[in-house]
């Protein structure tokens, strides 16, 4: 049986503020060779990572997502704060999130997880933390300097997104980083 590595997300268009912030990080942390930055043209907020998905299940997943999307209206997201996954001792991911994510996002995510559960793609045990990955950290040469740079990031709105659709992606892992192919765009409220 053939599979595809898939996930459902909200694709986030880049403003000028976000790439500028990433470039400042790269410049300030240029001596850190084990940090992989997400390409700014691939920024997305993952709602459900399905992982290895049977090709024969893809049409049913798309149909289920379309049914859910019809019940939800477009909404707005403002990404205005940064955070770390891992810990200050061992940071693993630097992310951009929201101080006050809208309830509409959580309602949509919950309905989508229910739909995926019904198809046998069960939810993760982790709580949903809506975020955009800025970079993944394999190892730090100078952890204190990294934390100093991280703590100096201005907390302001870096991205504003009018969410009008979901995107079902296929992910290809490559040595240079992941590549995403759009399988289906699914409008909200239609």
Task: Give the role of each language-model region.
Residues 1-190:
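Histidine-dependent nucleotide/RNA phosphoesterase domain, centered on the 2H-phosphoesterase fold
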């Amino acid at each position: 049986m053939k599979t595809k590595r898939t996930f459902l997300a909200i694709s986030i268009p880049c403003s000028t503020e976000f790439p500028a912030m990433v470039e400042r990080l790269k410049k300030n942390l240029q001596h850190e060779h084990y940090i992989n930055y997400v390409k700014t043209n691939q920024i997305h907020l993952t709602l459900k990572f399905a992982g290895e998905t049977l090709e024969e299940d893809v049409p049913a997943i798309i149909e289920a997502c379309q049914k859910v999307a019809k019940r939800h209206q477009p909404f707005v997201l403002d990404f205005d704060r940064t955070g770390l996954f891992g810990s200050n001792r061992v940071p693993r991911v630097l992310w951009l999130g929201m101080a006050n994510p809208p309830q509409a996002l959580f309602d949509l995510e919950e309905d989508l997880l229910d739909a995926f559960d019904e198809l046998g793609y069960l939810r993760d045990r982790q709580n949903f933390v809506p975020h955009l990955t800025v970079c993944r950290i394999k190892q730090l040469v100078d952890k204190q300097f990294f934390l100093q740079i991280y703590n100096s990031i201005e907390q302001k709105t870096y991205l504003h997104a009018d969410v009008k659709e979901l995107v079902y992606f296929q992910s290809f892992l490559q040595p240079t980083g992941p590549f995403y192919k759009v399988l289906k765009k699914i409008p909200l409220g239609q």
